[in-house]
Amino acid sequence: MPNKARIRLWSTNVNNLNYVVNQIKGIVDKTGVSMRGPIPLPTRRMEVPVMRLPHGEGRKKWEKWEMSLHKRIIDISADERVMRQLMRVKVPEDVYIEIQLI
């Protein structure tokens, strides 16, 4: 069985992301396994400029729509009971999780 598990989390809502990270930290603290992280990765900003007037007559006015993607990485020891508890964590719809066994 692999020794470590790498958990990657990303979301557009930083509050929901921190909520899930705190749940994972609570599980790790209760079980006593080693943990490294959460490591915040750079926030990716995506901008889409859109012209307000679709026909293009008159002044060209632009609106900018922006979305930020926040990411975290957590490395933990891959203990069987910890992994079972991680599968039971309630995750909001806008938070995505990827677990990789290293």
From Swiss-Prot:
GO CC, one annotated term: small ribosomal subunit
UniProt keyword annotations, A-Z: Ribonucleoprotein, Ribosomal protein
GO MF, one example: tRNA binding
Keyword Ribonucleoprotein in record: yes
Keyword DNA damage applies: no
InterPro entries (UniProt xref): Ribosomal_uS10 (IPR001848), Ribosomal_uS10_CS (IPR018268), Ribosomal_uS10_dom (IPR027486), Ribosomal_uS10_dom_sf (IPR036838), Ribosomal_uS10_euk/arc (IPR005729)
Pfam family, any one: Ribosomal_S10
GO BP: translation
SMART domains (alphabetical): Ribosomal_S10 (SM01403)
UniProt superkingdom: Archaea
Gene3D superfamilies assigned to the protein according to its UniProt record, in alphabetical order: Ribosomal protein S10 domain
Assembly notes: Part of the 30S ribosomal subunit.
Family statement: Belongs to the universal ribosomal protein uS10 family.
Function: Involved in the binding of tRNA to the ribosomes.
Protein name: Small ribosomal subunit protein uS10
Organism whose genome encodes this protein: Metallosphaera sedula (strain ATCC 51363 / DSM 5348 / JCM 9185 / NBRC 15509 / TH2)
Name of the encoding gene: rps10
